[in-house]
Amino acid sequence: MLRASQPEDMEEIVEIWLLASLQAHDFVDASCWWQAQEELRTRYLDHARIWVFEERGDLLGFMALVDDYLAALFVRPDRQGRGVGHALLQEARSRCAELHTRVFVENEPAVRFYRRHGFEIGGEVSDPLTGHLQYQMHYQAV
């Protein structure tokens, strides 16, 4: 079930972000993700509209929107491949006719996921936190 996040969800949201980041971004030193947790809270989550996917009381994933910027979409690693990410992205697309996000170039599964859902690569930028290249991806409803 999709629902808007509540303040009491925040610790579990950060846990999902950390676990999924460590798995999906293994090309980045793990200490980077551990150190970035507070920045995640203050830079994105405190300023974003967040939806969570919940099943039987457990949060399986979340997505965060800041205007038309998809700041985060993360699913617990042990729950990936079951439609959770698809449902979260559908929610974002239902709220914004146009979406922008950034995806690490090395994160090929995520690049494929977004391209399958209609996103196009618009350019590359260097991530200030890690120094790794990210694709700027864009979605426009037709």
Regions found by a protein language model. Give the residues of each.
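Conserved beta-hairpin
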Residues: 48-61
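A short, internal acetyl-CoA/4′-phosphopantetheine-binding micro-motif in the GNAT/acyltransferase core
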Residues: 69-80, 103-104
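Short glycine/proline-centered loop/turn elements that form peptide/ligand docking sites
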Residues: 85, 89, 106-110, 127-133
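Conserved GNAT acetyl-CoA-binding A-motif
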Residues: 94-106
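Conserved acetyl-CoA-binding loop of GNAT-fold acetyltransferases
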Residues: 115-124
